[in-house]
């Protein structure tokens, strides 16, 4: 069933800068009907209606309970959910998402979501939960892991038909309680890019997405996985107001481009006529693809400034928010997903139990997943024999020395014997300890008997539902047709109809002003686009002129001497938004074959001058080829060691990609609670299992 994106608007108080400028109030709100009134400097008013309107005196607790609480409940049930704050720089987006921890009423959406999730898991009976989190930022159109070992490493966005869009190499950390989540949030927030501008001393210079995965397994073994995206967007900026220069200006340019792409996606989704939705125009829209028109319940918190100095920015924010509420999503429960981390734990526990108790299986695990030590040894032996035959075949095809072959076979045999020894070293006590370590990662049911917590949770849910119903009822009252009402006198009916007519006239004038404003905005956008095109044209001409100067001095023996050919061979990569150019190569001096013996004299040329020129050029090339050491290398047969080294490098590359992936979820990773996305998502696509018993290495 399709449902619309829910939109709430929050207005912050005046800041010190606005007070110093003596700006006036331009925003008014009617919270009981979700109405926002924006007063233009010329006195004209514009009205917008949303799912919630929160003025200066509103609290983070009020916003969460009214709007976000039902969404988080749905995430625990297995839905995908997204909450993102949208607005200009300094409008209170980060404050709405993070809040102030020391003031209970002003805690933000993210810490409240942590409390909510762990309270819900603790009071739910007969379900085991696994909660893990990830934290990334998009800085200058580069995706980075804020919780990774190297938070400056650029990550790649990938897409799979059944999985959707994900970030390869993103670390996911298992959390058992609220303090663990807060520690991750604080660590990632400290790694995030922030900077000072004239409008905000702690301005976010990147978009950030904190994702909480909630996986639940019932006693029957079925798994549901919900995902909550908590998005804090960087704000749109005007250089004239922020005073940005240098790196700050470059950051602002990237921020504005990504927010512009987000606005284009929203407009295309609402338009209904667009056949193409431009999700790939930026990294932000690519990652939010499922949240806008996909399988996700989405909430937008539009943050605005009350100051008349920011009227244009506030109007733009309200317009985009008004469009966003017309986006239709189709959320469904994620049942038994292939990439569930809980399934990895489930299979590992079942595997350990079957090692010490043949025939035993884990909770909810299918019986066919259990296997005995003998079966494991048999599979190890089959893998060893297959690898040995492949290795021998490769060496025979390359006709390399037996010594090298024997050396590599011994290394392979040593790996096989080591894996067998690990099986023998696994005793019941050690296996039981490992099983307990894995089971300790699960949470759920700790407060199953706490009636007070359960009642509080149900009360909050009912209050949120009641608030939504009251808002809908209030809006329906305002939509009633006065002609359908029953009046006691004709004068009363005349007054009602006159009042309705005045409202319609006012609304009509508002639409006329809206059309004029839109024409003005379109004209400004057109001028902005023309200016951008003009600058890009200047940049392109500069690069072309530099290329014309450089091309004559490029060596003729390189493939890049032919620019037209390079252009034809270049391929555009849509995912990375860049050109994939051919590798640079240089042609070596080529002599005739050494064993050709007698070479026929070339046909006589009528023009001896041409032949003389050719001979001169050949002598010149031979003179320049001394550095290539042709005399020592040309007639020398290819060494066998070169073939061996090439085979080893190829074998190492293929092995690292297939048999020994670098980020396969091992026992240590599962116990430490740090797993990488590509270890789950790419494994779900591949039929090949990770290295056998890699998690059973004795410590």
From Swiss-Prot:
The record marks 444 as: Required for autoinhibition. Residues 4-327 form the Kinesin motor domain. GO terms for biological process: anterograde dendritic transport of neurotransmitter receptor complex; cell projection organization; cilium assembly; dauer entry; intraciliary anterograde transport; intraciliary transport; negative regulation of non-motile cilium assembly; non-motile cilium assembly. The keyword Ribosomal protein does not apply. Changing residue 444 to E: Loss of autoinhibition. Disruption phenotype: Worms are defective in osmotic avoidance, chemotaxis and dauer formation. One of its GO terms (molecular function) is ATP binding. Pfam families: Kinesin. Keywords: ATP-binding, Cell projection, Coiled coil, Cytoplasm, Cytoskeleton, Microtubule, Motor protein, Nucleotide-binding. Disulfide bonds: none annotated. GO terms for cellular component: ciliary basal body; cilium; cytoplasm; dendrite; dendrite cytoplasm; kinesin complex; microtubule; microtubule organizing center. ATP binds at residues 87-94. The keyword Glycosyltransferase does not apply. SUPFAM superfamilies: P-loop containing nucleoside triphosphate hydrolases. Expressed in an exclusive set of 26 chemosensory neurons whose dendritic endings are exposed to the external environment; six IL2 neurons of the inner labial sensilla, 8 pairs of amphid neurons in the head, and 2 pairs of phasmid neurons in the tail. It is found in: Cytoplasm, Cytoskeleton; Cell projection, Cilium; Cytoplasm, Cytoskeleton, Cilium axoneme; Cytoplasm, Cytoskeleton, Cilium basal body. It comes from the Eukaryota. Residues 339-523 form a coiled coil. InterPro entries: Kinesin-like_fam, Kinesin_motor_CS, Kinesin_motor_dom, Kinesin_motor_dom_sf, P-loop_NTPase. Kinesin motor protein which is required for the anterograde intraflagellar transport (IFT) along the middle segment of the sensory neuron cilia together with the kinesin II motor complex (composed of klp-11, klp-20 and kap-1) and on its own, is required for IFT along the distal segment. In addition, regulates the length of cilia. May have a role during neurogenesis and axonal transport. Belongs to the TRAFAC class myosin-kinesin ATPase superfamily. Kinesin family. Kinesin II subfamily. PANTHER family: CHROMOSOME-ASSOCIATED KINESIN KIF4A-RELATED, KINESIN-LIKE PROTEIN. This is Osmotic avoidance abnormal protein 3. The lineage of its organism: Eukaryota, Metazoa, Ecdysozoa, Nematoda, Chromadorea.
